[in-house]
């Protein structure tokens, strides 16, 4: 008989020869504790088909064990065996665990409203379980039901938890407020998060909330902090540039664009915005070159073509207009 613990050690060492055969041998063992560890190990290493068979065997032995049901159903869902997962769940007595698994399953097959209904039912069975409230809040959040999501996040916060699975609840609630147009509430909620706990998206969204409240200078400070902490947050350069432009601070707007382009030479939208600013408020020749580079990156990108065409027409530079034809993607104009 296969030594299960030796098999577990070999999996940890990535010694996977004859794995299917060895797992099948292990399934004949009566050491269920070792089999459970084997199933977990297989899942942890992404060996889901083999892990699924381990948990199938254990679940058939102990059908009343909710933990085994969870592992088994999650394995079926990972293998896209949703019909079989539903069949098993239909045979299980009503419980919060069953309803949460059904919610996961329906979410996986894009039946979000059914998933929300399942979690709502689970919440009624266990009204004080913060995990159920959080799971429901997350579904509502990603479904764009921000006010309902906020109420669920608030319930979790009332338990003393402000972070679950690495997700900051103040961040989620702040984004809900932002997406709902409650910009003052969004600022207050973002301000509850210390900078050390904020991720790049938090800084970005916080800046948007300040801008929406006509606090553009504060938004600029937030974006400057973000880019100093995470210079690879490339879309931040485009947004910070627009903030400077709104304040008519064209030199800083142009420099921000150039800084972003030094990090990503193929960011065509930033090429166009920076090029346009150069033409209007800086070095027009540099601006023209940036717009041409945008066309080299994507010759089906019409915006730089239109800007250059208008510019050359105003200057009556007909040779330059003709030269633009070399950038035209003929397939896009047929």
Feature annotation, model-predicted:
Residues 332-334:
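Conserved small/polar residues in nucleotide/adenosyl-binding loops
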Residues 13-17, 48, 82, 112, ...:
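TPR-repeat structural position
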Residues 31-34, 66-67, 96-100, 130-131, ...:
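Helix-start (N-cap) detector for alpha-helical repeat units in TPR-like alpha-solenoids
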Residues 37, 71, 101-104, 135, ...:
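Canonical tetratricopeptide repeat
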Residues 25-26, 57-58, 88-92, 121-122, ...:
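Canonical positions in the second alpha-helix
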Residues 12, 44, 78, 108, ...:
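Register position in tetratricopeptide repeats
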């Amino acid at each position: 008989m296969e030594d299960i613990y030796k098999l577990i050690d070999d999996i940890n060492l990535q010694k996977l020869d004859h794995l299917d055969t060895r797992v099948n041998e292990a399934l004949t063992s009566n050491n269920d504790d070792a089999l459970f560890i084997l199933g977990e190990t297989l899942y942890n290493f992404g060996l889901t088909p083999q892990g699924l068979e381990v948990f199938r065997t254990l679940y058939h032995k102990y059908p009343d064990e909710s933990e085994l049901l969870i592992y088994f159903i999650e394995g079926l869902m990972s293998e896209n065996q949703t019909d079989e997962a539903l069949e098993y769940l239909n045979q299980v007595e009503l419980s919060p665990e069953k309803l949460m698994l059904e919610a996961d399953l329906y979410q996986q097959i894009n039946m979000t409203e059914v998933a929300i209904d399942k979690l709502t039912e689970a919440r009624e069975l266990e009204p004080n379980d913060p995990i159920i409230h959080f799971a429901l809040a997350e579904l509502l959040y990603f479904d764009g039901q921000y006010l309902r999501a906020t109420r669920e996040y608030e319930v979790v916060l009332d338990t003393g938890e402000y972070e679950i699975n690495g997700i900051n609840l103040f961040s989620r609630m702040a984004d809900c407020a932002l997406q709902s147009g409650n910009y003052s509430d969004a600022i207050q909620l973002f301000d509850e998060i210390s900078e050390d706990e904020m991720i790049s998206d938090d800084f970005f969204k916080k800046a948007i909330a300040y801008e929406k409240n006509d606090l553009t200078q504060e938004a600029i400070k937030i974006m400057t902090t973000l880019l100093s902490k995470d210079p690879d947050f490339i879309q931040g350069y485009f947004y910070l540039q627009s903030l400077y432009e709104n304040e008519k601070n064209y030199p800083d707007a142009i420099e921000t664009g150039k800084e972003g382009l030094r990090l990503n030479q193929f960011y065509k939208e930033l090429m166009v915005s920076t090029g346009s600013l150069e033409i209007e408020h800086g070095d027009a020749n540099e601006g023209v070159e940036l717009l041409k580079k945008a066309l080299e990156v994507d010759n089906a990108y019409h915006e730089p073509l239109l800007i250059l065409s208008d510019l050359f027409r105003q200057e009556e530079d007909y040779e330059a207009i003709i030269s633009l034809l070399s950038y035209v993607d003929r397939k896009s104009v047929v």
